């Protein structure tokens, strides 16, 4: 279980994990921390009485850690894993190898994903932009795998790229085994500190992600051989409506991970990542 907070000018985030579990879309809590070269909070961290076993609060622009609790403990991240998936997607968009209007075809493997999903059918096509919304708003495991395969050919190759990116970011206590966080394998883990690193990288390099992560509800259209029908995406991050200034980022939950969240919110003078 992880709680992570991110901060940046005019932005604040908060997250917490409890002892409950769920295989469906749920609120989640996650953590984040900065590299050794970044400014950190004083050694004496006050006890805030938080139930979450791992927590980190960061000011996003400077990377200053404002609060942390067991931020270096390895834990199962659940769907917070998708933050790295989104980071790689936006890097492809930046390079021009991917366009928001490109169509992505859902494979049988992507279609077979359980847990939180948007119920894509095998052979169904959706634009990259719609897939991004499905991932960050509804936490769609099927959409995550479809995008991974579209970019790298196979999910396993995409996961290799995720782990390479983690190394580049100094996420030394992180290892990914899938692109969506559905697995509860002991070999799939991260820390609040590492979640903070990848979350900060995503929102600082690609602030447009917040235009998607702040969506509360939006309708997409499934178009398959069965016909066309609407489907409503609802944000799994309830902080979007329950915490003033919250604009993201990603929740996650499995029976092992419990509830996790990496949250981003705006403050009067700073934005924070939790």
How would you describe each model-predicted region?
Residues 15-193, 203-204:
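Active-site-adjacent loops and short helices of periplasmic peptidoglycan-processing enzymes
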Residues 48-50, 54, 154-274:
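Penicillin-recognizing serine hydrolase domain
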Residues 1-13:
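Sec-dependent N-terminal signal peptides of Gram-positive bacterial secreted proteins and lipoproteins
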Residues 6-7, 62, 111, 270:
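Generic "edge-of-domain/loop-turn" microfeature
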